[in-house]
């Protein structure tokens, strides 16, 4: 059987606090681990999407509206719905691992790095679909 949930794949969260949010898979664990005895993925997603920007807005207002609030989480495969999209995040692959979640300072540092990476991606204009909220 072909593995669908691979690193770099964009998925939607279907259950829980972040239901309906878009995430990108950073690392997948098919067999499970001691702390999570089921197939799961370490994901980074967008908790708060950037707001709409128009030409008439000033630079300061555009900068405020272009902020992205990320989250990192370990999610069961059953709660992820894969999409056809992929997102290239080479600098995040080794940064967020299952051990990152044990230490709060590591977690916040990882979130800051994810935030910077997401904002860079958003500023370039590529992967625009990832940074728009899902309408349903």
UniProtKB/Swiss-Prot annotation:
InterPro entries xrefs: Ribosomal_eL27, Ribosomal_eL27_CS, Ribosomal_eL27_KOW, Ribosomal_eL27_sf, Translation_prot_SH3-like_sf
Domain of life: Eukaryota
Gene (UniProt): rpl2702
Protein name as annotated: Large ribosomal subunit protein eL27B
Family of the protein in this entry: Belongs to the eukaryotic ribosomal protein eL27 family.
Alphabetically ordered keywords of this record: Cytoplasm, Ribonucleoprotein, Ribosomal protein
Gene Ontology molecular function: structural constituent of ribosome
Function: Component of the ribosome, a large ribonucleoprotein complex responsible for the synthesis of proteins in the cell. The small ribosomal subunit (SSU) binds messenger RNAs (mRNAs) and translates the encoded message by selecting cognate aminoacyl-transfer RNA (tRNA) molecules. The large subunit (LSU) contains the ribosomal catalytic site termed the peptidyl transferase center (PTC), which catalyzes the formation of peptide bonds, thereby polymerizing the amino acids delivered by tRNAs into a polypeptide chain.
Species: Schizosaccharomyces pombe (strain 972 / ATCC 24843) (Fission yeast)
